[in-house]
């Protein structure tokens, strides 16, 4: 009997992950393409392209073809997907032809944005393409019983978006999607350092600062970190010391928007499911779940237990792949 290869793709703003039914996560590559602006030629894709960010001549730019979880540049996304599918085939150890693919999309994406993702994946050789809402994929990947009539609350803080959803009986009961995620927190840090210290730093440095001394809006033991950048006054390299308290303040507004989305979703919850939320709590997934103190801060703010998924960075990809096994129970969430 003929059996197609089945894979799940987490088409993230920051990273693309591929899940194979038999091997689990087989690929995790940055969603970055390096392009020569004069010839429009693609020079590098994925990890190689990310390593070029901020280090290339003026005519070579490293761009992210995905923005806020949806396609910003169709042609480049197709190039990126072709590269990913080729590498995935090698990882599986066979040249798969016409695989069945499930791709996650932000729950707030438009019909046009979803169609663009579906078409791009089909153009890369997929036989069938199913789209699953990101929070549902995250819930499946976090081992929540999404097909049972109990409330599962997922907060997926990705690179481009934060998705908050209450899932019950295979569908989304209440959901809020905001285009704020890890990338925005990085931008907040870049902007703060530029305004306060007249220092220009790159997004990779900002990400490092966020991961090392970034904290959610909760009391913590102060930390410091030395960073280097370009002095905007002299144009020369300069080293400064950043304090964790000022980085916390830089990210404050974006973190409050995330909290607002969580509160709005919980307020929309039907009364019958509210008891489940108090008992079961909220699950955090995505890279943002790794921010220092975010679990404790959210628990304090929403007065509901908050837990971090076992593999927050991979939950969406795992759930996207696993959803093929329960596709008939998830008709509301899979299109």
From Swiss-Prot:
The lineage of its organism: Bacteria, Bacillati, Bacillota, Bacilli, Bacillales. Induction: Expression is sigma I-dependent. Its main location: cytoplasm. B.subtilis has three MreB paralogs: MreB, Mbl and MreBH. All paralogs have the ability to support rod-shaped cell growth normal conditions. The multiplicity of paralogs becomes important under stress conditions. They are probably used to allow cells to maintain proper growth and morphogenesis under changing conditions. Keywords: ATP-binding, Cell shape, Cytoplasm, Membrane, Nucleotide-binding. This is Cell shape-determining protein MreBH. Belongs to the FtsA/MreB family. It comes from Bacillus subtilis (strain 168). GO terms for molecular function: ATP binding. Pfam families: MreB_Mbl (PF06723). It comes from the Bacteria. Forms polymers. Forms a complex with Mbl and MreB. Interacts with the C-terminal catalytic domain of LytE. Forms membrane-associated dynamic filaments that are essential for cell shape determination. Acts by regulating cell wall synthesis and cell elongation, and thus cell shape. A feedback loop between cell geometry and MreBH localization may maintain elongated cell shape by targeting cell wall growth to regions of negative cell wall curvature. Filaments rotate around the cell circumference in concert with the cell wall synthesis enzymes. The process is driven by the cell wall synthesis machinery and does not depend on MreBH polymerization. GO terms for biological process: cell morphogenesis; regulation of cell shape. GO terms for cellular component: cytoplasm; membrane raft. Disruption phenotype: Disruption of the gene leads to cells that are curved, bent at irregular angles and affected in length and width. It is found in: Cytoplasm; Membrane raft. InterPro entries: ATPase_NBD, MreB, MreB_MamK-like. ATP binds at residues 13-15, 159-161, 207-210, 287-290.
């Amino acid at each position: 009997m003929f059996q197609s290869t089945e894979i799940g793709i987490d088409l993230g703003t920051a990273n693309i992950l591929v899940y194979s039914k038999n091997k689990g996560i087989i690929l995790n590559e940055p969603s970055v393409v390096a392009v020569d602006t004069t010839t429009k030629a693609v020079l590098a894709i994925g990890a190689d392209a990310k390593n070029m960010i901020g280090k290339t001549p003026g005519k070579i730019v490293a761009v992210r073809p995905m923005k806020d979880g949806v396609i910003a540049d169709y042609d480049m996304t197709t190039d990126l997907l072709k590269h990913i599918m080729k590498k995935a085939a090698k990882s599986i150890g066979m040249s798969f032809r016409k695989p069945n693919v499930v791709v996650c999309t932000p729950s707030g994406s438009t019909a046009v944005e979803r169609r663009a993702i579906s078409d791009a994946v089909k153009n890369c050789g997929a036989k069938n393409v199913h789209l699953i809402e990101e929070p549902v994929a995250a819930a499946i990947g976090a081992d929540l019983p999404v097909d049972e009539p109990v409330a599962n609350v997922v907060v997926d803080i990705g690179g481009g978006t934060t998705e908050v959803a209450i899932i019950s009986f295979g569908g989304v009961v209440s959901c809020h999607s905001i285009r704020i995620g890890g990338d925005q927190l990085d931008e907040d840090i870049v902007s703060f350092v530029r305004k306060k210290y007249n220092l220009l730093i790159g997004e990779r440095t900002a990400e490092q600062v966020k991961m090392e001394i970034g904290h959610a809006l909760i009391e913590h033991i102060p930390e410091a970190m030395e960073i280097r950048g370009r002095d905007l006054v002299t144009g020369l390299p300069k080293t400064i010391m950043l304090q964790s308290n000022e980085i916390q303040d830089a990210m404050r507004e974006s973190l409050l928007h995330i909290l607002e989305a969580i509160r709005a979703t919980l307020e929309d919850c039907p009364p019958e499911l509210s008891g489940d939320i108090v008992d079961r709590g909220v699950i955090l997934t995505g890279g943002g779940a790794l921010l220092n103190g975010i679990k404790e801060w959210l628990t304090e703010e929403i007065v509901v237990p908050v837990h971090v998924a076992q593999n927050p960075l991979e939950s969406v990809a795992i759930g996207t792949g696993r959803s093929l096994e329960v596709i008939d129970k998830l008709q509301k969430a899979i299109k």
